[in-house]
Amino acid sequence: MGDPRCAPLLLLLLLPLLFTPPAGDAAVITGACDKDSQCGGGMCCAVSIWVKSIRICTPMGQVGDSCHPLTRKSHVANGRQERRRAKRRKRKKEVPFWGRRMHHTCPCLPGLACLRTSFNRFICLARK
């Protein structure tokens, strides 16, 4: 190591250590999943923002988090059909959801609702 030509190589090897954040500041990347039941409490299995072909455990929406409304327009129909539709809509919002989520966000935590704040922006807010 006394050779001066080794200094640039040593610096190159140690440089990544200088820019690595301490353990407490690093991002936590949750694991891949197929179903909500594979994720811990307060999480759901949602589409990755970066790679659409995989799903990752994602935290459920807290107050102020952006969300997706996950609602359908209701059509005028007889009572039985409307009850079935309402039941299906409710099931889509539940965690664990037994189907495959097609959006990158989870529903809001219990007690919160996904409410419109502007034309195309929805956030989790306390139910009124």
Curated annotation (Swiss-Prot):
Question: What keywords appear on the UniProt entry?
Answer: Biological rhythms, Disulfide bond, Neuropeptide, Secreted, Signal
Task: Please give the superkingdom of this protein's source.
Answer: Eukaryota
Major localization class = secreted
Q: What does the record list as GO biological process?
A: angiogenesis; chemotaxis; circadian rhythm; coronary vasculature development; endothelial cell proliferation; epicardium-derived cardiac endothelial cell differentiation; epicardium-derived cardiac vascular smooth muscle cell differentiation; negative regulation of apoptotic process
Q: Where does the UniProt annotation locate this protein?
A: Secreted
Q: Name one GO molecular function term.
A: G protein-coupled receptor binding
Residues of the signal peptide: 1-26
What switches on expression, per the entry, is described as: Activated by CLOCK and BMAL1 heterodimers and light; inhibited by period genes (PER1, PER2 and PER3) and cryptochrome genes (CRY1 and CRY2).
SUPFAM superfamilies listed in its UniProt record: Colipase-like (SSF57190)
Disulfide bond annotation, renumbered to this chain: 33-45, 39-57, 44-106, 67-114, 108-124
Q: In which tissues is it expressed?
A: Expressed in the SCN and among a few other discrete brain areas, including the islands of Calleja, media l preoptic area of the hypothalamus and the shell of the nucleus accumbens. Highly expressed in testis. In the SCN, expression subjected to high amplitude of circadian oscillation.
Q: Does the keyword Disulfide bond apply?
A: yes
Keyword check for tRNA processing: no
Q: Which GO terms describe its cellular component?
A: extracellular region
Its function, per the record, reads:
May function as an output molecule from the suprachiasmatic nucleus (SCN) that transmits behavioral circadian rhythm. May also function locally within the SCN to synchronize output. Potently contracts gastrointestinal (GI) smooth muscle.
Name the family the entry cites: Belongs to the AVIT (prokineticin) family.
Protein name per UniProt: Prokineticin-2
The species this protein was found in? Mus musculus (Mouse)
